[in-house]
Amino acid sequence: WELYYTLLLKDLGCSSNAARICELYLTDDLSFKHDFKTVNGSLPKVLKFVIGHTGLGAGLTERFKAIAHIVQHGDEIAQELIQTRCTRGADIARQLRFGNGVAAGIHSLDEHWNGGGRPERLKGEAIPVLSRIALLAQVVDVFNVSDGADAACWEVEDRCGSWFDPAVVSAFRRCAAEPAFWEQLSAPGLEAAVFALEPGRFVVPLDEDYLDEIAIAFGQVVDAKSPYTAGHSARVALYTEGIAAELGLDEQRRRWLRRAALLHDMGKLGVSNAVLDKPGKLDEDEWAAVKRHAQY
């Protein structure tokens, strides 16, 4: 059951480095993260990615300065971004009452079989098996969606023994040989199929206190996206509680309102930090993106 929840929650910490990515790369964090997943870590491809994604909307001088800074401090920057995401994701998983197995699986998601990953440079069997499986699954999904099954299989073989545990690759080969495996991934009922896989023996009573903790945790995920909104959801919940009390609402009603307040900005995760943290006036398209956060 730990693998199931590791896979679903592996990106819990992603919002925590979004603002930093925008600051360093002068770019849209959403497209940056999406495209970076296709980079295999080789220096030529990393450099090509940096040049192709840094400061495209900035002035020439500003762009050159950003690229030079990234090239000079690339290793430190990569370590900072991944360390932040992995640590935050693992912490939130624990806050959601998942055990150390799930938390460790999330924390070590970017470790590579050959020891070249991050954040701890773990190697081989020292990497939690949940992380080894999740990393391969993530790469397969990215390349299958963008370029098809053949491209996904090629990437797995290319990274076997470097990024990926050969034993996990061997298991994937057996799955990939079955046409039904790929057909299910593109089937309209995929979400329902994933929910049906939930391990029945892992049952946690969903009481009122647990619901509160879930709302608090996801409020923190949202607030971590931008330094300008740190603690915002918690403060809105506090204001909501005070107003509801003044209106004479009962405790149960106030509790639900607090949860709604903590989660009111969930859709902000779908808005780029290039928009959220922009120091100047937003243009028409940027305002439209901000307004869509309620829909998200």
PLM feature spans:
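Histidine- and acidic-residue-rich, metal-dependent catalytic cores
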Residues: 1-296
